[in-house]
Amino acid sequence: MSRIAILLFVAFLLVAGISAKSTAHFKKNVLADLFKERRFNAKRDPAGSTCVNIDVDSFCDGMAERGACNIIPQMATNCAKACNSC
């Protein structure tokens, strides 16, 4: 009986350690993306686009207003409605 309890305890520790590691990695990536976006906004503040579709989510609208459609190639596919609303 004690062997089973020890094995279950070790298995629990392994699962808890793996989940804690993946959660920390996820939080690290989210924070890194947030700071990258802030650095991008601080470095580049183009004149802006007058053509923004208000129905799209606010991130795409904000990036399109800053002129990111012309600067970032991925904007054309990821935020197509905001970039092509003229």
UniProtKB/Swiss-Prot annotation:
One of its GO terms (molecular function) is potassium channel regulator activity. It holds the Pfam family ShK. Disulfide bonds join C51-C86, C60-C79, C69-C83. Residues 51-86 form the ShKT domain. The keyword Secreted applies. The keyword Translocase does not apply. It is found in: Secreted; Nematocyst. Its main location: secreted. Residues 1-20 form the signal peptide. GO terms for cellular component: extracellular region; nematocyst. Inhibits voltage-gated potassium channels (Kv1/KCNA). Belongs to the sea anemone type 1 potassium channel toxin family. Type 1b subfamily. This is U-actitoxin-Avd10a. It comes from Anemonia viridis.
